[in-house]
Design a protein with these regions (language model features):
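Conserved ABC ATPase signature
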Residues: 156-161, 165
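ABC-type ATPase nucleotide-binding domains, specifically the catalytic core motifs of the NBD
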Residues: 15-18, 57-61, 74-79, 114-133, ...
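P-loop NTP-binding/switch modules centered on Walker-like glycine-rich loops
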Residues: 183-187, 191-273
Length: 327
């Protein structure tokens, strides 16, 4: 199957006054057209930095120091790492060919402008249409994402809307130019449980209707089970396992993946029985100087794990893992 995005040996570093922090440390990843890739990991594992790298939105002092991010379209290939993030070419791609839904809708919209103006601006930046056509398209897309009475409420300002409605506006803005790639960075994190369910239902509707390639970032494996075709498990700037969603849940290999699945609460667990947890905490990027980043927390650690770094190798057609238990 054709890939839309090919990432190879990607490194993203943050240059601090006294040190360099490696946020992404040599990622190789292919994202198939019209499929949903779930990216899972604890906070601090580099999920959002990876997404921002693709979008060309890494904030200073961060920068891509090595590797390629290839966007494939119409028999052409564009290395996004070679394009200035503020250039006209990148502005034409971002918001048009690639869009992103951020995890904090309340801080992602401009409070000075009403929601209609902000979506209309997105359309007119990327498409040669007048204000009237842009307004009608804005009303249409808001209807599609379940925003009530958009004809009159497009004049509402962000502070007048609930978190769920704001996230629908963000989804509408991301979809309005029909992008090839849609990145959803924990789009349900700031919402309550019932609104989360509504947003996930909407995202599945988008998958079927618009058929974009989706990168869905979350720390919730339950969400991934509903949304994803493939899953990449990230830990401290690296992918430690990459497999189909069925393989991840039925046959997880990496001890970190197994730990994440075991720590999921279930309805049929015994009362008063403690939840299973992964011991320890995620180390800071670059803190583990040699060996596997997971060895201080791993229940199956071996002496080799402390000295050498395992490669991400194919176990089968649908599964890769980075662990000395298998290579």
């Amino acid at each position: 199957m054709n890939n839309l995005i090919d990432i190879s040996t990607l490194h993203v570093d943050f240059q601090l006054e006294k040190s360099i922090v490696p946020a992404i440390n040599g990622i190789d990843l292919s994202i198939k057209k019209e499929k949903t890739l779930g990216i899972v990991g604890e906070s601090g594992c580099g999920k959002s930095v990876l997404a921002l790298s693709i979008m060309g939105l890494i904030p200073p002092p961060g920068k891509v120091t090595n590797g390629k991010i290839i966007l494939k379209q119409d028999n052409t290939e564009i290395d996004l790492t070679k394009i200035d993030s503020n250039s006209q070419l990148m502005r034409n791609i971002r918001g048009n060919k690639m869009s992103m839904i951020f995890q904090e809708p309340m801080t992602s919209l401009n409070p000075v402008f009403n929601i209609g103006e902000q979506i209309i601006e997105t359309i007119r930046l990327h498409q040669k249409v007048n204000y009237s056509v842009s307004k009608q398209r804005t009303i249409q897309i808001l209807k599609e994402v379940g925003f009530p009475d958009p004809e009159s409420r497009i004049f509402d300002y962000p502070h007048q809307l609930s978190g769920g409605m704001l996230q629908r506006v963000m989804i509408a803005m991301a979809l309005v130019c029909n992008p090839l790639l849609l990145i959803a960075d924990e789009p349900t994190t700031a919402l309550d449980v019932t609104i989360q369910a509504q947003v996930l239902k909407l995202m599945n509707k988008i998958k079927l209707g618009y058929k974009p390639t989706i990168i869905f970032i979350t720390h919730d494996l339950g969400v991934i089970a509903k949304m994803a075709d493939e899953v990449a498990i990230m830990y401290v700037g690296k992918i430690v396992e990459h497999a189909s969603v069925n393989e991840i849940f039925s046959n997880p290999k990496h001890p970190y993946t197994i730990g994440l699945i075991q720590s999921m609460p279930t309805l049929n667990r015994q009362r008063n029985k403690p939840l299973i947890t992964i011991k320890g905490n995620v180390p800071n990027p670059g803190e583990i100087k040699t060996g596997c980043n997971f060895y201080p927390r791993c229940p199956k650690v071996m002496s080799k794990c402390k000295k050498e770094e395992p490669l991400l190798l194919n176990l089968s057609k649908n599964q890769k893992v980075s662990c000395f238990l298998y290579n």
